[in-house]
Amino acid sequence: NFSNSHPDVLIGLERILGKAPELFEVDCCDAGAMDRTISAISKRGNISGVIHFAAYKAVGESTEQPVKYFQNNIGSTATLLDAMERHGLQTLVFSSSCTVYGQPDEIPVDESAPILPAESPYGYTKQVCERLIQDAQSSRPEINAALLRYFNPIGAHPSSEIGQLP
């Protein structure tokens, strides 16, 4: 869905890419919908991995509606990992967050910093999702995963076609 974005992003992507990206509007918490979508793409033989950016992202809102964040952020990741296993997909790029570091002891923070208690439900969901992915890797060593821990991404594509949504 476009709860954190807007369909107009697709117009900007089309201008940059020179062709329209294919869109599958899917509730990532719906296992049946995920299976149908991955099956449809896999039948074409052109799926090599998954980029998982489907999550609620407002720290403040997460303190007001923590259950909503747990259900969506953790639920969608668990559902996706399950679907990936059923379809033999082994590569995942996960959009995590610097919030997994909690209140770090040292600044600047790098990848070797310890994971400390999260300061928000949003941060906690990212910690849990990272753990789910790491546990999936432990049980299936063929899984390749990258956990992207963003700080404050800002700016737009040089064309200004994408990158300025809140």
What are these regions (language model features)?
Residues 26, 95-96, 148:
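Short glycine/serine/threonine-enriched helix-capping/active-site loop
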Residues 53-57, 96-97:
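Conserved NAD(P)H cofactor-binding loop of Rossmann-fold oxidoreductase domains
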